[in-house]
Amino acid sequence: MTRSIKKGPFVADHLLKKIEKFNAQGQKKVLTTWSRSSTILPVMIGHTISTYNGREFIPVFVTDQMVGHKLGEFAPTRTFKGHVKSDKKAKRR
């Protein structure tokens, strides 16, 4: 179920305030945030936002194609190391 249009997209208040402040000053600093559930808005285009994935901050450069997605979509939390080639259990003859 999608979010109500009446409510609007969720963006953490502290993140939105920082971005609006940087836009007013014309700065392009790297922002760090733990808010993976914040929606990317058009005012964030051109900024680099470091999103926490549970272990480290992953820098995400926001482009126009990312608008409407969540910040957490671009900072994966799990590392896939690949399947083992010589795994006999996986082969099953």
From Swiss-Prot:
It holds the Pfam family Ribosomal_S19. The keyword Ribonucleoprotein applies. It is found in: Plastid, Chloroplast. One of its GO terms (biological process) is translation. Its main location: plastid. InterPro entries: Ribosomal_uS19, Ribosomal_uS19_bac-type, Ribosomal_uS19_CS, Ribosomal_uS19_SF. SUPFAM superfamilies: Ribosomal protein S19 (SSF54570). Keywords: Chloroplast, Plastid, Ribonucleoprotein, Ribosomal protein, RNA-binding, rRNA-binding. GO terms for molecular function: rRNA binding; structural constituent of ribosome. Protein S19 forms a complex with S13 that binds strongly to the 16S ribosomal RNA. Belongs to the universal ribosomal protein uS19 family. This is Small ribosomal subunit protein uS19c. It comes from Tetradesmus obliquus.
